[in-house]
Regions:
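Short N-terminal binding/cap micro-motifs at the start of the first secondary-structure element
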Residues: 1-3
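Conserved N-terminal catalytic core of the sugar/cofactor nucleotidyltransferase
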Residues: 6, 13-14, 18-91, 100
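A structural signal for short hydrophobic beta-strand segments in well-ordered beta-sheet cores
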Residues: 12, 125-127, 196
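Structural beta-sheet core signal
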Residues: 38, 89, 111-112, 196
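A secondary-structure boundary/capping signal
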Residues: 91-92, 199
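Conserved core of the sugar-phosphate nucleotidyltransferase
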Residues: 95-171
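Left-handed beta-helix
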Residues: 158-159, 165-239
Length: 239
């Protein structure tokens, strides 16, 4: 995302007049989430300051990922703030439209998905008779068009941490990183049930050109703002 992120961390880049992270945080608040742990890296202090200022009523914890070695590794950093209750993982630059409150009380692990034209850019879900049977990170050959959008629900935070910890201890990397998709695949093989929540409202912010398109879509969706009324205005014609 250079040069946009030279001076601003990606989650704070503006989309439709607000930082990406604001859209994400609002969705979590609407779903009843009251405790958020943020994993930061580049320019992380700016994210910490912004969250504390904008969301003072939410319990927030922060951890720093010094080395960018994958999402599963980042999730492990939140382990000390996570109990055995339901836990969500949401990427800070993932914009989506979904009612996450439907996940309350869900006993399965749930993956939010959306159909895409180019699944090679994403982790994907393979279904058989409506059941999740395999999770594949950025497949080289098309096996499914159901992309993992970066929103996950886990019925047990403790079992999530166990899956990520096992992956890291085994040294199992994909494209040089510890992928959360691979950790979930290990959980699936160990009998953990997974379901999907399929949505259409997913907005890609991975590249500058898609960020511009997402900005346009969200502005169109929200409709035009009110036009201010000018009191006692005068128009001065050019000479």
């Amino acid at each position: 995302m250079r040069p946009l992120t030279w001076s601003t961390p990606k989650p704070l880049l503006p989309v439709a007049g607000r930082p990406m992270l604001a859209h994400v945080m609002d969705t979590l608040v609407d779903a009843g989430v009251d405790h958020v742990t943020l994993i930061t890296g580049y320019l992380g202090d700016e994210i910490v300051s912004w969250v504390r200022k904008e969301y003072p009523g939410i319990r927030t914890d922060f951890a720093v990922q010094e080395k960018t070695d994958g999402l599963a590794s980042a999730v492990l950093l939140a382990g000390e703030y996570t109990d055995d209750g339901p836990t969500m993982v949401v990427l800070g630059d993932t914009l989506f439209s979904a009612d996450l409150s439907v996940l309350r009380g869900e006993t399965r692990n749930m993956i939010v998905t959306s159909p895409v034209e180019d699944p090679s850019r994403f982790g994907v879900v393979l279904l058989e008779e409506g059941r999740v049977v395999r999770l594949i990170e950025k497949p080289s050959e098309p096996v499914s068009n159901l992309a993992i959008v970066g929103v996950y629900y886990f019925a047990s935070g403790e079992r999530l941490m166990e899956g990520c910890r096992t992956l890291v201890e085994k040294g199992q990397r994909t494209r040089g990183e510890f992928q959360l998709t691979d950790a979930m695949e290990l959980m699936l093989r160990n009998g953990e049930p997974f379901g999907i929540l399929d949505i259409d409202g997913w907005y890609d912010c991975g590249k500058p050109e898609t960020l511009l398109e997402t900005n346009r879509v969200l502005l169109d969706r929200n409709g035009p703002g009110e036009t201010p009324e000018l009191i006692r205005s005068r128009v001065i014609q050019p000479c």
